[in-house]
């Protein structure tokens, strides 16, 4: 699931979705959350019983628009091992430079997300008071 969703920023209750998915009988149901929009600063899906967290590192995590990459974080070692095996076999691992560039961006992630949220809140104020704007989609 992607929450907030793109483009309407609809919110899914991750914990409720995970509870429903994990309570189903039969095969294991994996709950995966695309956390690109929120980053780990604003939302921690593993703490809400998601099994996998997926993100586009190109966006907020990197912060400098100089890396193309993504990440998958798993809640249990079995999933970590399975993902690592397939990523290694298929050559889907990041280069050392891309890894370093992403780590560089992570140093300022908290400050940048704080600024993004403040700027977005101000834009919402402006747009909601503008007579030509009929709807503002804002989960905050």
Where are these predicted regions, by residue range?
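Conserved PLP cofactor-binding pocket of PLP-dependent enzymes
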Residues: 140
């Amino acid at each position: 699931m992607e929450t907030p969703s793109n483009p309407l920023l609809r919110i899914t209750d991750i914990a409720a979705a995970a509870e429903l998915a994990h309570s189903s009988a039969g095969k294991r149901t994996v709950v995966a959350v695309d956390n690109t929009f929120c980053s780990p600063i604003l939302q921690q899906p593993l703490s809400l019983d998601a099994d996998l967290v997926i993100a586009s590192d190109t966006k907020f995590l990197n912060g400098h628009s100089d890396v193309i990459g993504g990440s998958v974080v798993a809640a249990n070692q079995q999933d970590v091992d399975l993902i690592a095996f397939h990523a290694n076999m298929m050559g889907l691992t990041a280069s050392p430079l891309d890894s370093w560039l992403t780590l560089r961006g992570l140093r300022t992630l908290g400050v940048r997300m704080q600024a993004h949220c403040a700027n977005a809140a101000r834009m919402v104020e402006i747009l909601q008071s503008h007579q030509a704007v009929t709807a503002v989609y804002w989960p905050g």
